[in-house]
A protein has these predicted regions:
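Generic N-terminal leader/processing signal
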Residues: 109, 165, 193-195
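Helix-loop junctions that connect tandem helical modules in alpha-solenoid scaffolds
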Residues: 98, 159-160
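Extended, charge-rich alpha-helical regions
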Residues: 81, 85, 174-175, 180-199
Length: 199
């Protein structure tokens, strides 16, 4: 889905970090956990999605959970390039055993986190702490991923207005779908509905 940059820019202009709400002429509104559940179907109850900010041996972590050791050129600090994940885990090998299937599943979820759900401003890197949360795929659904996505979006909106960034991180699909669903697109005037031009 393409992101409507004009819509996102207009929303960003109305964002207030003090209240984590958008200020419109008709009042304040914001993306809520309920919106995350309805629009993304992510769990909002369960274990907090958190982890260590630094990982002692990032190469060992990738080898343990993904079965490969990434080249040092794709790692910066405690994050890895999403493009490397895309190219390395493109096609599941035929006759893959359960361990390889789990490694590819972790890589796929990690790509989703880094490029769609909780991307940074570049949407090009993902933090290794999320890989640690994916270690046991049987309990991944027990984490409050929706809360993490919403917190990341709020933080990215805050940074977007305070740091005057060119690009903004966070789940833009959530923000855009929420705007289409929640922000008034029409008003009743004399029995008919007219479009509001607020963007």
């Amino acid at each position: 889905m393409d992101v409507n940059h004009f819509l996102i820019s207009s929303l960003l202009e109305r964002w207030r970090s003090e209240t984590h709400t958008f200020h419109f002429p008709h009042g304040e509104t914001t993306v809520t956990l309920e919106d995350v559940v309805v629009l993304l179907d992510l769990p909002i109850d369960g274990d907090v999605v958190t982890g260590p900010i630094t990982v002692q041996d990032i190469f060992a972590t990738f080898h343990e959970h993904l079965g490969v050791i990434p080249p040092p050129t794709v790692i910066r600090g405690n994050s890895i390039r999403v493009s490397w994940l895309n190219s390395t885990f493109q096609q599941l090998p035929p006759n893959a055993n359960n361990e390889v299937i789990a490694q590819y599943a972790r890589a796929y979820i990690l790509k989703l986190i880094g490029s769609i759900l909780m991307p940074d401003t570049s949407a090009a890197r993902v933090h290794v702490m999320y890989l640690l949360r994916l270690a046991n795929l049987n309990v991944v659904r027990n984490c409050s991923w929706g809360s993490a996505v919403l917190a990341c979006l709020y933080r990215c909106l805050d940074h977007g207005i305070h740091l005057r960034q060119e690009n903004i991180g966070g789940c833009m699909i959530l923000l855009q779908c929420w705007a289409w669903e929640s922000v008034a697109t029409g008003i009743a005037t004399g029995g008919r509905t007219e479009k509001i031009k607020w963007v």
